Amino acid sequence: MAASTTSRTNSRVNYSNEIHDLSTVQGGSAAAAAAALFYPDSKSIADIFPPHLGKKVISEVVATFLLVFVTCGAASIYGEDNARISQLGQSVAGGLIVTVMIYATGHISGAHMNPAVTLSFACFRHFPWIQVPFYWAAQFTGAMCAAFVLKAVLQPIAVIGTTTPSGPHWHALAIEIVVTFNMMFVTCAVATDSRAVGELAGLAVGSAVCITSIFAGPVSGGSMNPARTLAPAVASNVFTGLWIYFLGPVVGTLSGAWVYTYIRFEEAPAAAKPDTQRLSSFKLRRMQSQSALAADEFDTV
C-alpha cells in the first residue's frame, strides 16, 4: 500500500508546475509539498486557501488591470485617431505590457492574466484546480476595473478598445485559435520546462503576443484573452461576436498546451531529481549563476 501511494505521488509530481508556486520547492520535502498542493486529498481550509493565495490573487488583479488598461487604451486611441497610434503601435504596446507583467508578477502568481491560460495550466496539471475560480475572479475583476477607468478618463470616446470581427465570424474564430495556440505553445515552453529560455521567458511570451497580434488585429482584434474582450464589451455595451473570444482562446490555449506537452522530452522521475530542478527556470538560472560566481571567488582565494 505504501509503495503504491509513493508511486502515485511521484507520477503526480512529474506534472507539477515549475514556476507557479515557488513556496513549495524549498527544503528536502519539495516533492511531497508539491503533491499536497496540486492534488490535495482533503478539502480542508488549508487546501482551499493555501498560504499566500491572497497575494497571488491581488497580483493577478493588478497584472490584468494593467494589461487591459494598456491594450484597450491603445486600441481606443487608435480607433479615435489612427494618426496618434498605429496598428503596429497597438501590437507593440500589447507585447511590452505582457513582458513587463511577467517580469513583475511572474514569481508571485505566474502572471496568467488570462482565464484561458489558467484553464489550460490546470487541465495539464501545471496549476491546482482548486485555485482556478480565485484566479478567474481576479482576472475578470482587474479587467473590468481597467475598462471602466478607461471609459471615465477617455471621454468622449464611447468604444473602449473592443474586439469585434471585421469579416465573417469563422475567419475571426480561426485567427483567434491560431494566435492563441502560438502564445500558449511558447508560454508552456518557458513556464513549465526548466530547460527552456529561463531569464528571457517574459520576452519570449511578449514577443509571441506582439508578432501574432500584428496580423490578427485587422481580422479579429487579436484578443487572445476572454477577460480582455469581455471587460471593454461591457463598458462599451458592444457584444458583437463575443462568443468568438471565449471559444477561440480556450481552444487555442488547450491545443497549444497539449502539443507542447506531447512533444517535450520526458524528464527523469521527480524523486531522482535534485531539489534545484523543482525551481522555476527564472530562479534556477539565478542560483546557478550565483553558484558559479561563488566557485570562482573560492578558486581565486
Swiss-Prot record:
InterPro entries referenced in this protein's UniProt entry, alphabetically: Aquaporin-like (IPR023271), Aquaporin_transptr (IPR034294), MIP (IPR000425), MIP_CS (IPR022357)
Natural source organism: Zea mays (Maize)
Residue span of motif NPA 2: 225-227
UniProt name for this protein: Aquaporin NIP2-3
Topology within the bilayer: Multi-pass membrane protein
Broad class of the protein's primary localization: membrane
PROSITE patterns assigned: MIP
Record has Transmembrane as a keyword: yes
Sequence motif: NPA 1, positions: 114-116
Any one annotated GO CC term: membrane
Similarity section: Belongs to the MIP/aquaporin (TC 1.A.8) family. NIP (TC 1.A.8.12) subfamily.
Keyword Transmembrane helix: yes
PANTHER family referenced in this protein's UniProt entry, alphabetically: AQUAPORIN NIP2-1, AQUAPORIN NIP2-2
